[in-house]
Amino acid sequence: MYGIEYTTVLTFLISVILLNYVLKSLTRIMDFIIYRFLLIIVILSPFLNAQNYGINLPITGSMDTPYTNSTREEVFLTSTLCLYYPTEAATEINDNSWKDTLSQLFCTKGWPTGSIYFKDYTNIASFSVDPQLYCDYNLVLMKYDATLQLDMSELADLLLNEWLCNPMDITLYYYQQTDEANKWISMGSSCTIKVCPLNTQTLGIGCLTTDTNTFEEVATAEKLVITDVVDGVNHKLNVTTNTCTIRNCKKLGPRENVAVIQVGGSDILDITADPTTAPQTERMMRVNWKKWWQVFYTIVDYVNQIVQAMSKRSRSLNSAAFYYRI
């Protein structure tokens, strides 16, 4: 009886020892394989040139700085392009498949189907209130209207440049613009802006700080206003804050993933006269207009030349980015 128990215990111990030996052998074999594999990777890594998708690139300085992809594929094979156009274009074309047609035409220029996005807007005024530019490259078509030249110029200035903005509390504080790059940008359904310049004693210059009727009116019932006043002078402001938001903004530099294309018009809009626009922008262009099909054909034909004057952004943005640069 005791012999059977001893045999059972001995068998169990031998089994444990054998299992331990097998596990240690497997561990040594796996270590050998892993270390050999890592050694091969270390030896070959200087000769490999591939994209590392695991790196989160830091955004410092200008957000328009392009990061070069080490694999250097053609830009249109890995990018998205947004085309913004007035709704009247789709109304005139009157073809349910016109976007598919254009997508196939863009494909002949190297842009794969699915990389082109079409976004319509009602008019310049409504687009300026909530511009959303989400693609790697954004082309904004603006049909020329002699009555909206100022709105078009201000919208182009807003889209083609990057702004760092902060809120303004006009009920408590006076504000001044420090230099030419410092502007006050207002957006809303109806923006009426009045200003009263102040002297060193905070008394109004040509106006009474207690009477807004004596303030100089610089904008009336507009949806987008970029206000420029005399630098280095304090101002008291009066703004229709119930329908408008005003921000204190600094122009940082070009927003290089956006191009504005003026459609038609005898006069050519130009924002390069602004001394803060440096270098002179090449991303504001004009095409002739007869029919919208002709306009889109022209865009397709020259899309790659247009993109060459632009730089791909590192992330998307919406109208909030014009107020807060994060």
From Swiss-Prot:
Keywords, alphabetical: Calcium, Capsid protein, Disulfide bond, Glycoprotein, Host endoplasmic reticulum, Host-virus interaction, Metal-binding, Outer capsid protein, Signal, T=13 icosahedral capsid protein, Virion
Chief site of localization: virion
Cystine residue pairs: 82-135, 165-249, 191-244, 196-207
Name of this protein: Outer capsid glycoprotein VP7
PTM text: N-glycosylated.
Chain residue ranges for the region called CNP motif: 165-167
Sequence similarity: Belongs to the rotavirus VP7 family.
Other observations noted: Some rotavirus strains are neuraminidase-sensitive and require sialic acid to attach to the cell surface. Some rotavirus strains are integrin-dependent. Some rotavirus strains depend on ganglioside for their entry into the host cell. Hsp70 also seems to be involved in the entry of some strains. In group A rotaviruses, VP7 defines the G serotype.
Assembly and oligomerization: Homotrimer; disulfide-linked. 2 Ca(2+) ions bound at each subunit interface in the trimer hold the trimer together. Interacts with the intermediate capsid protein VP6. Interacts with the outer capsid protein VP5*.
Keyword Ion transport: no
Molecular-function GO terms, alphabetical: metal ion binding
InterPro entries found in the cross-reference section: VP7, VP7_1, VP7_2
Residues where Ca(2+) 1 binds: 95, 206, 214, 216
Subcellular location: Virion; Host endoplasmic reticulum lumen
Signal peptide: 1-50
Positions glycosylated per UniProt: 69, 238
Role description: Calcium-binding protein that interacts with rotavirus cell receptors once the initial attachment by VP4 has been achieved. Rotavirus attachment and entry into the host cell probably involves multiple sequential contacts between the outer capsid proteins VP4 and VP7, and the cell receptors. Following entry into the host cell, low intracellular or intravesicular Ca(2+) concentration probably causes the calcium-stabilized VP7 trimers to dissociate from the virion. This step is probably necessary for the membrane-disrupting entry step and the release of VP4, which is locked onto the virion by VP7.
